[in-house]
Amino acid sequence: MTRSLFLLLASACWAQQPPAPLTFPHQTEADWVAHDFTFHSGEKLAELRMHYITVGVPARDASGHVSNAVIVMHGTGGSGRAFLSAGFGGELFREGQPLDAATHYIILPDDVGHGKSSKPSDGLRAKFPHYDYEDMVRAEYALVHDGLRVDHLRLVMGTSMGAMHTWIWGELYPDFMDALMPLASAPVEIAGRNRMFRAMIIQAIRNDPEWKNGEYTKPPEQGLIAAQYALWMMTSSALQLHKTNPTHEKADAAVAALRERAIRTDANDMLYYFEASTDYDPSPGLEKIKAPLYAVNSADDEVNPPELGILEREIKRVPHGRYILLPTSDETRGHGTHSRPVVWKQYLIELLKESDRHAALLNPRHEFWAQSAPEAFHVKLATTQGDFTIEVHRDWAPLGAARFYNLVRAGFYDNSRFYRVVPNYIAQFGIAGDPAVAAVWRSESLADDPASQHNVRGTVAYAMTGPNARTTQIYINLKDNLQNDPQGFAPFGRVTEGWSVVEKLYGGYAENSGGGMRAGKQAPLFEGGNAYLDREFPRLDRLLSAQVL
């Protein structure tokens, strides 16, 4: 087989067999058995074998929890071994790469029905229990939690079918992971052309006279060939097919080689692959996903064509979701782009950084908060009125400056609201837009700093209900407010650029949208977050992002 033909076959969502897997540090391969596993169909297996490869070693924190585990799930018809290739593992697991095997514990399972895990071709054939995607995810979870004794995942990532599993993981086990990255998928029911080509594959096998309800003595070759043709055309890239097969002779040879591969595939295994996706539909539960999620698709993916606009619509329902569409290029491979980290690796790096910050936001004891602040630094705040800059001096209020520095680093203030703007008095912000984050920090009080500066126009300080009660809320003095000095309000910085932006922040609601801090009237802001403020006070300006310069 030529290299170009191999690359084409490998781009198919279920054809992921690398020519020469690499070996990584502490690489092991084994089986784990789940006993008396019950499927959604009601069928049971006394012993469900889950084959897996692991790379690296688990690291445990002071509480004994695994902190560096990653699961990567393969596509339809694939296996975990596919991820050991130079093109995938070489880009991600080597020294200095985002999932460096020296610092991560990487779990590569063979899914139910696939690879060396339990599957119809082991002997049960058509009597093998009918599994669906949720069954497969429950088996993955059992392997991770019960088999490998991992109680938390740093990252859940999958390609194609594995990407669809990633959405399900986020809904079934929302507190089990720090980040999710589905590659080449959509979080909705499989319908339209996607379902049609799957139905063609299923019917091609079932309608072959040799199939005999799965008890064939001779492989149903014509059905398998027709199924493979449909699959290949959907999962390949028109650009790459033309580049690697520029003559009719090469194109015909590629089809002939594809035919030979098709007849070596077990028909029952293949049928089960595609029937498992029939009831897939995570769309009703997208709001349950808690961890940051980056959904990555490519513009030349015929299985998940971007013109349908599905992910643009659905990602808005994922609390910390982001959709990335990779443009067609010489590096993309249609649906198979999911297995080319060289194209999308930079987004994995961004996701891991964001999820680190997100984990810190939910845990005030996280090591993230130990970072000391510089003696002086500048923070740029991007708002719906424009940008302005705060210059912070640590010696003005050391504790307050340090917390502000780290809150900005963590993204605490990003996508929040200026909820209390009282003209000719103050502009206040600092309640997180995510109620889960806001609740964590609501009572994380700081000891007072001595007030070394006056509350003059342009200075910034923490709002508080009394002594030693500073948390995250910040106000900007819109005029000289010297009456605040004897009450212990200690400025830690001042606005040095963009004062006209501060003056334009919407103040029409005054105290009504977020005042009453001392009277305990801010509960709706903490409990409802941005959703409450946007519904009740839609004209409030937004703090889009805060960045240490």
Give residue ranges: language-model regions.
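Alpha/beta-hydrolase-fold enzymes
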Residues: 176-260
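Cyclophilin-like peptidyl-prolyl cis-trans isomerases
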Residues: 360-549
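Conserved alpha/beta-hydrolase "acid-adjacent" motif
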Residues: 302-310
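Conserved hydrolase catalytic core segment
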Residues: 151-195
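Short beta-strand/loop motif that positions the catalytic acidic residue
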Residues: 289, 295-297
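Catalytic active-site module of serine/aspartate enzymes centered on a nucleophile-bearing elbow/loop
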Residues: 318-360
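Conserved acidic catalytic loop of the alpha/beta-hydrolase fold
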Residues: 134-155, 172
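N-terminal cap/lid subdomain of alpha/beta-hydrolase-fold enzymes
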Residues: 53-122
